[in-house]
Amino acid sequence: MNVKEHVISLPRRVFVGHDIVYDISIYFSQLGVTPPFLIVTGTKYTKKIADKVIENLPKDAKYEVVEIDSATLDDVYMVEEVIKRISPSLLLGIGGGKVIDVTKYAAFRNSLEFVSIPTSPSHDGITSPFASIKGLQKPVSVKAKEPLAIIADIEILSLSPRRLINAGIGDTIGKIIAVRDWKLAAKLRGEYYGDYTASLALMSAKHAFQCTKIINKDIKYGVRMLMEALISSGVAMGMAGSTRPASGSEHLFAHAVELIHPEGILHGELVGLGTIIMAYLHGINWKIIRNRLKKIGFPVKAKDLGLSDEEVIKALTIAHTIRPERYTILGDRGLTWSSAEKIARVTKIID
């Protein structure tokens, strides 16, 4: 790779354990961060977690809270208004993917550090220096700030809705496809391929695959395994300086569906469906992936997510246009309507 400089953006510390939010003041002391803090959180369950974090901040710490319920540019602007007013030294993102995406993007735009405190293991954005923000030109990830630290409290994460946990598994297993697509682009287009970062992403996928054997028996152990996989995937992106190790044709399909059917479906759920479909195209055993996901209660049919056959087929035909510079198994021309329909039926995504 003939570039003058390659910057690797990684978290300084990762704290994983049980009931560790009660030790947040100790962690902040270790990190050398001081008030004032700006806390970004959700409006419902995550706000309760944020309140617990606030109770354990350093004594007399000055802070302000912003509550959001989406990840749009308007939400980012709302956070930035408070940044201008209180000049915080640190942002804390306490919530799910939307909260953390808004926090890291606002931190990036304002040259601030941020700490990621996820309340659900729904996708690998808890670690990565990229964010998905609605209101931009396309539904793809944009450059954002990597977290200074991650505080992953397994007690909190294991209480998140099972649907969110399953979505995290779907998102992470998708790295199997992303790495295959990356290899294909290197072979056919001469694109740079990073063996180490690809191996790290693939290891994350395999770890999540193993998680499907455990999660029904031991939720806390399974969630810890999943968190390790999500963190590793985010680190792979930070090392690569792009989302390439973690986002391929399975994500293009997910983004295409999000354009057609923008509400009510979790990102990781769509990535899981996309992984089954793209595994078929790559000649990978898609049946094993489908069966493993089905056993944990993952929705493996489009209708389970409220998607029509036509929406799935259309998404498959336009997926290659979402990010044309990123070569995948879909090629430059994508799939015809008839071939997309055939593949969706063969993989049992549609009946």
UniProtKB/Swiss-Prot annotation:
Catalyzes the NAD(P)H-dependent reduction of dihydroxyacetonephosphate (DHAP or glycerone phosphate) to glycerol 1-phosphate (G1P). The G1P thus generated is used as the glycerophosphate backbone of phospholipids in the cellular membranes of Archaea. CDD domains: Gro1PDH (cd08173). NAD(+) binds at residues 97-101, 119-122, 128. Its cofactor is Zn(2+). Belongs to the glycerol-1-phosphate dehydrogenase family. One of its GO terms (cellular component) is cytoplasm. Zn(2+) binds at residues 171, 251, 267. The gene is egsA. Substrate binds at residues 124, 171, 255. This is Glycerol-1-phosphate dehydrogenase [NAD(P)+]. PANTHER family: GLYCEROL DEHYDROGENASE (PTHR43616), GLYCEROL DEHYDROGENASE 1 (PTHR43616:SF5). GO terms for molecular function: glycerol-1-phosphate dehydrogenase (NAD+) activity; glycerol-1-phosphate dehydrogenase (NADP+) activity; metal ion binding. InterPro entries: G1P_dehydrogenase_arc, G1PDH, Glycerol_DH. It catalyses: sn-glycerol 1-phosphate + NAD(+) = dihydroxyacetone phosphate + NADH + H(+); sn-glycerol 1-phosphate + NADP(+) = dihydroxyacetone phosphate + NADPH + H(+). Binds 1 zinc ion per subunit. Signal peptide: none annotated. Its EC number is 1.1.1.261. Pathway: Membrane lipid metabolism; glycerophospholipid metabolism. Keywords: Cytoplasm, Lipid biosynthesis, Lipid metabolism, Metal-binding, NAD, NADP, Oxidoreductase, Phospholipid biosynthesis, Phospholipid metabolism, Zinc. SUPFAM superfamilies: Dehydroquinate synthase-like. Homodimer. GO terms for biological process: glycerophospholipid metabolic process; phospholipid biosynthetic process.
